[in-house]
Amino acid sequence: MTAKSSADVFPILVTKHPAGDVYYCGWSSKRSFGASSWLVLGAEGNVLIDSPRWSAPLAKQIKKMGGINQIVLTHRDDVADHANWAKAFNCERWIHQDDADAAPEAEKQVIGLDVLSLRKNLKLIPTPGHTKGSMVALLGDQQQILFSGDHLWWNPKKSVTVASKDYCWWNWTEQLKSVERLLDLEVHWLLPGHGYAHQFKPGQWNEALEQTLRHEAKSPSSGQI
C-alpha cells in the first residue's frame, strides 16, 4: 500500500450532515488571501462555497465525488479562480448583485436582503457589512452549518465569535445589523473563509452572537474582540 500523496488528501471531510456531507477543499489561493473553501455534497448536486486555487488534482478528486453543480461566492474577496472551476464543471455561479463586479461572468445574482433558497436545504442570506454584497450560506434546518465567508469567525483564545471592524471594507454599522439577522439560527458548525471554524453546542450560538453585540455596544471604537 502506498501513502496518499498530499495532492490527493483534499477534499477532507469536516462533518456528515443529513442535508449533505461537508468537506474542506484546501488549496487556498493568494488571490483570496488564503481563504478557505468548502464542498457540500447533496442529492440535488454538489455545491462549492467560495473558490479555492485552481488545482487539477483537487478537480480530479471532486469529479470522483460527483463534480460541482453550483458555486456560491460569498463576497468579492474570495472569488479566486472561480472561472476555472466553472469551466471545468460547467456549473453556474451565484454572487450578490452588490459584489457582482468581482465576478462579472457569474450566471446568477442574489438581489437585496431577501433570503434565497438555493435548494431544499441550502439558503443564501445577504449579510452586508464586510463588503456591500457579503452573504452567508446556511445548510440544514436543524444542527445547521453556517458558511460565513468573512462575516464571522471564531476566536479560540477568547472563546468568542468575531465580527471584525479592522477587516470591514464597506460599512461596520451594517455589518453589526447583519450579525443580528443571524441570532435566531441554530448553528452547529461555523465554517468561515478566514479564521477558525467552531462547533457549537445547543444554545451556544445565540449566546456567542449576543456577546459579540454586547461587546461592540460598549466599545464602538474597538476593531476586534
Model regions and ranges:
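Short, surface-exposed connector motifs at secondary-structure boundaries
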Residues: 43-46, 62-69
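Short His-Asn-centered micro-motif
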Residues: 49-52, 73-75, 96-97
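Cys/His-rich short segments
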Residues: 1-3
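Active-site-proximal loop/helix segment associated with metal-binding centers of metalloenzymes
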Residues: 27-36, 97-111, 155-162, 217
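Conserved beta-strand hairpin/beta-sheet module of binuclear metal-dependent hydrolase folds
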Residues: 9-58, 136-154
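Metallo-beta-lactamase
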Residues: 5-20, 46-48, 54-56, 60-63, 68-78, 80-132, 141-142, ...
